[in-house]
Amino acid sequence: MNVKVSNANQPTWKIVTVKSHLPEALKKLDEMAHNLWWSWSADARTLFRSLDEELWKKVDKNPIELLRRIDYDRLKELSKDKELLARMDKVYADFHAYMTEKPNAKRASVAYFCMEYGLNHVLKIYSGGLGILAGDYLKEASDSNVDMVAVGFLYRYGYFTQSLSMDGQQIANYEAQDFDRLPIERVLDKDGNQVIVDVPYPNFMVHAALWRANVGRVPLYLLDTDNELNSEYDRRITHALYGGDWENRIKQEYLLGIGGMLALQKLGIKKDVYHCNEGHAALCNVQRLVDYVQSGLNFTEALELVRASSLYTVHTPVPA
C-alpha cells in the first residue's frame, strides 16, 4: 500500500487569532457554529445553508468555514433581512434553551474516554463504527442532559482516504486538518495561553495541548501533541488515527488513558463514573489507582473504588 502525506505539516504551527467579521446582528451565528449541536439540528443546518447555498456546498457544509468565507456585502445584506433574522432568532432561542437546561444532580456524572469520535464529517477524528457509536453516545448524552465530559485526540491528519493507483493498488491519502477552520476551540488558562498537559512517559515527557469541541451540552476535550514543545518523533503521536508502528500505538494509548486523566485533573474535573469505550483508554484506571493511593487509601481500597466506578465497552469479544 502506498502512502501519500500532505506537506502541510512541514511549517511550524503558530497561534493566529482571526476575529470574526460578522455584523453585530449576526453574531449569534458564530456562537452556534462553534457548537456541534448544529450537526443534528435540521433547523440550524437549514439556517446556515440559507446564508449562501452555493458557498455552503463549496465549504462541504462546514459553518465555521462558511462564516469565514462569506462575502461581507452579503453579510450586510443578511443583517438587514428581517425574515432571516427572525429565523436566526428562533433557532438561537431553541439552542439557548437547550444549553441552559441544568442536568439532574441525582444522576451519576460520567467521564468518557475513546480513541475516536464520529460527530460530523468536517471533524476528521474517526474512521468507522467505533467512532460513529462514540459520537452518537455523546449526542444522546447531551439530549438526555447527562452530566458528562469526554476525552479524545485531535488528529492532525485523522484517518486516511482511499484512492487507487494506475495498477489498482490502494493509496492512503493523509490530508492535514486546519484546526482554525473546525468547530473546536483552544482551552485557555487565566492568562489566555493554551492549556498544556505534561504527561510523564518512561524517561521523557510529552506535552499535549488541549482543545475543546462542544457537543451540545457535552464538552469533548481533545489532546494534541503536534506542537513545538515535543520532539518531531513525539509530535506524531496524534498525527493519525491508528497510525504508525506499535510503539506509536502504545504511546497513543498511554496518552489517552494517563494523559486524559491528567487533563481532567488540570481542569479540576471529577466525575462519578469513568467509562472506557474499548481498551485503548484502559490506563486511565491505572492513573486513578495511583491517585487514590497517593490520597491515602491502601491498594485494596483503591482497587475496590476504581472497580465500583468503572464502565467498559468491548466491541471485539473474540481474538482479532
Language-model segments: which ranges?
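Catalytic cores of carbohydrate-active enzymes across secretory and cytosolic contexts
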Residues: 1-320
